[in-house]
Amino acid sequence: QTISIGSQWDVYLHGIQTRLFDEHGFGSKKATATFLRHVEKIQPDIIHLHNIHGYYLHIGLLFERLKSWNIPVVWTLHDCWSFTGHCAYYAAAGCRKWETRCNDCPQTKVYPASWGWDRSGKNFDTKKALFTSLKHMTIVPVSRWLAREVKKSFLGVYPCLTIGNGIDLSVFRPV
């Protein structure tokens, strides 16, 4: 069963909130609440998250509900957004602030771009509090590099199991 989250209009509003106030992941309250009511009806035994950024979920509502349900969560990570105060990737900027606490982000103009404020410190603190509030979560990075980074982050408190992205070896092969 596929459950849609919000509408295209909601995505646009969340994007505007991100651009103006650097609040990526803090919009879409109504869409997230509606989605969570659908999930609650299903009463799943486990929740499997992937990318939760993309202008469609309110991470506070999501993680507060996950905490109250107290069911296992598996979170597959495809990038670094979950443990930074702003960016999805930081290597190009040579930034390691996320290892202690993000602030004065050198990449506010990069996805998820903010034209206004730099809330990377507040975002970092909020993400850390929310994302480490669950009792039963396993982090699944899609590469060994990402697993090493996760273990240096606040998400390092959780079990971490790398499962690489699958590739078709009949099409792709070492050169």
Residue ranges and their predicted role:
Residues 1-175:
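Catalytic cores of nucleotide-sugar-dependent glycosyltransferases that transfer UDP/GDP/TDP-activated
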